[in-house]
């Protein structure tokens, strides 16, 4: 959906491949892999505006990596945002966190708390309640895809 939304606009869509399964405590492997991908992108094509999009642990990794100067914003779908997750690095970033309140894997309440804390740190953060989909986003998948694509395209258009 994102690829279609930005087609013909000179946008590269790339995917982070995790080296390890899971977050792995303080190692935060997924976040490190996202940061490595940003550095690899910079080496390949120079400094360009970046929007990070991630689901669940990928949303957490995207939010952690958002301190990179190239990152314009983040779209996080049903992100895993445990209390105490750092937000200080998010000042000046636009963040969209989408979450279905019936999600039983990750907590919408923790996402909304993250949004409040990110705002206090200077981020332009928005929590978007979704009314369908649960964690896997299977029911209403077209809505989730459309919203992710629209928000990603909007973030790329700003600035």
Question: Which role does the model predict for each range below?
Answer:
Residues 53-58, 62:
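Gly/Ala-rich beta-loop-alpha elbow adjacent to hydrolase catalytic centers
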Residues 1-47:
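Serine-hydrolase catalytic machinery in alpha/beta-hydrolase-like enzymes
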Residues 91, 96-103:
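Short beta-strand/loop motif that positions the catalytic acidic residue
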Residues 104-113:
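Conserved alpha/beta-hydrolase "acid-adjacent" motif
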Residues 112, 119-159:
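C-terminal catalytic histidine-bearing segment of alpha/beta-hydrolase fold enzymes
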């Amino acid at each position: 959906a994102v690829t279609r939304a930005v087609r013909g606009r000179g946008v590269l869509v790339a995917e982070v491949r995790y080296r390890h399964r899971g977050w792995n405590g303080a190692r935060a492997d997924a976040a490190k892999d996202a940061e490595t991908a940003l550095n690899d992108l910079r080496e390949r094509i120079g400094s360009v505006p970046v929007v990070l999009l991630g689901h669940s642990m990928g949303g957490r990794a995207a939010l952690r990596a958002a301190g990179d100067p190239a990152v314009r914003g983040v779209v996080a779908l049903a992100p895993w945002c445990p209390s105490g997750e750092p937000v200080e690095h998010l000042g000046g970033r636009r963040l969209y966190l989408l979450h279905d309140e019936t999600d039983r894997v990750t907590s919408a309440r923790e996402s909304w708390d993250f949004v409040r804390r990110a705002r206090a740190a200077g981020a332009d953060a928005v929590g978007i309640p979704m009314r369908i989909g649960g964690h896997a986003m299977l029911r209403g998948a077209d809505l989730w895809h459309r919203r992710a694509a629209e928000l990603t395209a909007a973030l790329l258009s700003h600035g």
